[in-house]
């Protein structure tokens, strides 16, 4: 996993809370439901040709696997915090930038790949644009190489 630093997984506080909520739901709702589905399927008799039993057991395996995955992420989570008050771009920063040539303005937050969600304007710290911006400051002009090179000007860096 690329977002492991010293065996820690980089997450925003918001993403950690989402993962904890998902884990709680899996344990308290999904796991309980699938156990009941298995009991119901067992009560139908012969398990060798019981498709409902097989489906429920497969579903249980998927749920248990996801629970273990989430527990591992939580146990290794390191909350990323932007450099408060700094104009330097870091993981967690919200950045507004302008394409120097087209004048197009984009705003997004740089997060870990686990947090990344382009539909919510959250990009991975491993994306080419984030790699070009990390460590730069408000007002800097930076060259980005995504299939072709272009320049952007950092208009604003918000670290909260």
Swiss-Prot record:
SUPFAM superfamilies reported for this sequence: FKBP-like, GreA transcript cleavage protein, N-terminal domain
Database matches in InterPro entries: GreA/GreB_C_sf, TF_GreA/GreB_CS, Tscrpt_elong_fac_GreA, Tscrpt_elong_fac_GreA/B, Tscrpt_elong_fac_GreA/B_C, Tscrpt_elong_fac_GreA/B_fam, Tscrpt_elong_fac_GreA/B_N, Tscrpt_elong_fac_GreA/B_N_sf
Pfam families registered for this protein in UniProt: GreA_GreB (PF01272), GreA_GreB_N (PF03449)
Entry coiled-coil feature ranges: 3-84
Superkingdom, natural source: Bacteria
Gene Ontology biological process: DNA-templated transcription elongation; regulation of DNA-templated transcription elongation
Keyword presence, DNA-binding: yes
Keywords: Coiled coil, DNA-binding, Transcription, Transcription regulation
The keyword rRNA-binding appears for this protein: no
GO MF annotations in UniProt: DNA binding; RNA polymerase binding
Signal peptide feature range: none
Role: Necessary for efficient RNA polymerase transcription elongation past template-encoded arresting sites. The arresting sites in DNA have the property of trapping a certain fraction of elongating RNA polymerases that pass through, resulting in locked ternary complexes. Cleavage of the nascent transcript by cleavage factors such as GreA or GreB allows the resumption of elongation from the new 3'terminus. GreA releases sequences of 2 to 3 nucleotides.
Family classification: Belongs to the GreA/GreB family.
Protein's UniProt name: Transcription elongation factor GreA
Provenance organism: Mesomycoplasma hyopneumoniae (strain J / ATCC 25934 / NCTC 10110) (Mycoplasma hyopneumoniae)
């Amino acid at each position: 996993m690329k977002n492991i630093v010293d065996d820690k997984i980089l997450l925003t506080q918001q993403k950690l809370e989402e993962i904890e909520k998902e884990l709680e739901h899996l344990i308290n709702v999904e796991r309980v439901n699938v156990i009941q589905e298995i009991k119901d399927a067992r009560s139908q008799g012969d398990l060798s040709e019981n498709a409902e039993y097989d489906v429920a057991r497969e579903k249980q395996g998927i749920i248990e696997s996801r629970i273990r995955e989430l527990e591992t992420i939580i146990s290794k989570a390191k909350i990323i915090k932007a450099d408060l008050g700094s104009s330097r771009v870091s993981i967690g920063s919200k950045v507004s930038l302008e394409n120097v040539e087209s004048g197009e303005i984009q705003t997004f937050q740089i997060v870990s790949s686990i947090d990344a969600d382009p539909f919510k304007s959250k990009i991975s710290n491993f994306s080419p644009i984030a790699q070009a911006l990390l460590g730069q400051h408000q007002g800097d002009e930076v060259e980005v190489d995504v299939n072709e090179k272009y320049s952007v000007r950092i208009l604003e860096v918000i670290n909260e």
